[in-house]
Amino acid sequence: MQSSSSLFPVALMSAERRGDLVEDVYRLKPGNSPDATVELAVTRLGLVDQARPRGVPVILLHGSFSNRRFWYSPKGIGLGPYLARAGFDVWIAEMRGHGLSARNATWRTNKVADYARYDLPVIGAFVKELSGQVPHWIGHSLGGTTLAAALGGQYLGESDAASVALFGSQVSRYYWPLKIPPVQWAGRLLLRSFEHISGSRFKRGPEDEPVGVALESMRWHGLFGRFGERDNHWWAGLANVRLPVLAVAAEGDHQDPPWACRLLLERFGSGQRQFLSLGRRQGFSEDFDHVRMLISTAAQEQVWPRVLDWLQQRPVGESLPAAEPPQGVAAET
């Protein structure tokens, strides 16, 4: 089968009509990470009767224990369809082992560093190749954290993103016992006995998370820990990011509280930074929580239009020359 990309092997898994929407699902097999079995599913949404060329691309990244359905329900409801109906070219990525993305051979040890270093750059490159424009990126929870890691680690740059929006994303809230080495060691030893953390068992969401993500988070928040890799300080690297950045927090979010979301925003060196907290004190109908900030009737009425305004106020992505494969990816011949 002929690849849908000149950058790396890509297969069109399905092309379906969903009401007023067109849904194309692609499977990317970039082969750029140490685990060559990694495959990533990306869903593209557009309008059936779209007479003009597709609009500016927007890439949506789900959080932990989640998948594409966070952005796009089977009934065609969600921020993804909303933006598609507003004329944007919507792309919904699913991380390794989530949704339509199969579990790779080393799935148990997957971590944010892998997503940021290997996966986001190839997703962005593929979207740029097919759309011919620089995409906007929107991430929720761990999706936003991964996006921050990719930017701070310089795996994504200004040529890869027109703007960034982070919803309920932070790395500053921690549990003080993790700063005590014996507690940290015991926790890591316990986690290593598991392959994954069950989303359904702990009522966190429909997907499981690899234990590698949890171990990585413990390292970030341990004594002398930091947001980054051993050889790449993402937290410090955010100061060099000049892209427009929107950070959205929810007043009722106890998992990723507003003060921590604001701290992450303030690390960015961009001169175009906006912070929005969703609560009654700010004029909203409720104190939104971690999920309702994007999935609720109230969010549909009060939050989604804010996202649309943010995107429409950003400069339109320029047309691009033929894309080159990200570092570590061999072009298809």
Summary of predicted features, one role per range:
Residues 109-129:
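Alpha/beta-hydrolase active-site loop
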Residues 257-267:
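Short alpha-helix in the alpha/beta-hydrolase fold that links the catalytic acid
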Residues 274-333:
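Catalytic active-site module of serine/aspartate enzymes centered on a nucleophile-bearing elbow/loop
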Residues 94-98, 170, 281:
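Short beta-to-alpha linker loops that shape the active-site pocket of alpha/beta-hydrolase fold enzymes
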Residues 47-100:
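Short, surface-exposed "cap/lid" segments of acyl-processing enzymes
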Residues 241, 247-249:
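Short beta-strand/loop motif that positions the catalytic acidic residue
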Residues 7-50:
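N-terminal cap/lid segment of alpha/beta-hydrolase-fold proteins
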Residues 129-133, 137-138, 142-229:
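Alpha/beta-hydrolase-fold enzymes
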